[in-house]
Amino acid sequence: MIEEQITDFSNSIFQAAFKQYFQELGIIVSDWEDLFKQMNKDKETIAFIRYNNNNDCIGFIQVKSTIFSDDFFKEPYGFIRELWVNKKYRLCGHGAALMKLAEEYFYKNGIYKSILTTSTAPEFYKKLGYEFSFGCKAKNNDPVYIKQLKLIES
């Protein structure tokens, strides 16, 4: 099994997986090339992909660093943008492993809270230590979950 951090979303393994992910969600994209170009313009977003020796993508997680601030406070958060595991590999721990990669990345980069939205897998995220945030509202109206990150011993 291979795990790779990517910042270039023209990666063919990532692109094939992302297309499959959107297909599962029923999202139609008229110009994939433009979508991946737009992703590459966002220099704050990275992804981790997990694949086998046949370059079959097991899953990916796409994350972004963001800062919540006002006139008095400023706090960085790690935003879990997308998490997807290929149906063939679900329920085998790959989603949790991808989440761990993202959380370790955040922690090593001085980000100690992770935030995400989900309408499809709240129990999965709760098992990983995420808690529903009553005061935080997402623009997509999905429930928001936050986790205080701790140093992870490997």
Predicted regions and their residues:
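Conserved active-site alpha-helix within GNAT-family acetyltransferase domains
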Residues: 108, 112, 119-142
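Conserved beta-strand in the GNAT
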Residues: 56-66, 79, 84
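A short helix-loop-beta-strand connector motif used in the catalytic cores of GNAT acetyltransferases and
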Residues: 37-49, 79
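Short amphipathic alpha-helix that is part of the acyltransferase structural core
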Residues: 1-34, 47, 51, 154
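Conserved acetyl-CoA pyrophosphate-binding loop and the N-cap/start of the following alpha-helix
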Residues: 89, 93-101
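Conserved beta-hairpin
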Residues: 45-61
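A conserved beta-turn-beta hairpin within the catalytic core of GNAT-like acetyltransferases
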Residues: 66-80, 90, 139
